[in-house]
Amino acid sequence: MDKKIGLFWLRDDFRFIKNHGLIEATTKHNQVVVFYLYKKDVFNYQEAQKWWLSKSLSNFKKKLNELNITLEIVETNSFKNFFDDLINKKDFAIYWNKVYEPDYLKFDKYLLNILKNKKIDHKRFKGNALNEIDEVKKGDGTPF
């Protein structure tokens, strides 16, 4: 087991089983911290989504507590600012599942580049989509 802290960035994938990022963090590290970045401005006028999110986080936290894993909910205005601060800490590895929205994909590209340049252990996993876009091919091997 790796002595570094394993961080799992919980996004919009609240599966407990077959959550590949969470599985990777818990099998490779003795200490795991799960964190959710809450951007208040995203939910300003979306009361139903806030309710769903609070219930999902509460249920996920209960399951994590059974495994002695902490869930930290961090309110931030910017993913970039949060990760710029986090990257200055050295003894961690980070895992997360992909979110397929364009803004998230753009940020993932930025984050993957920064983590690689800083030589921080990291891995992004397929999200809760059935197939990645580039995995679906026609019979002749070309994309649809």
Q: What are the functions of these language-model segments?
A:
Residues 1-70:
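N-terminal beta-strand-loop-alpha-helix module at the start
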Residues 78-144:
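Beta-rich, aromatic/charged-enriched effector core domains that present basic-aromatic interfaces
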Residues 69-78:
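Short beta->alpha junction loops
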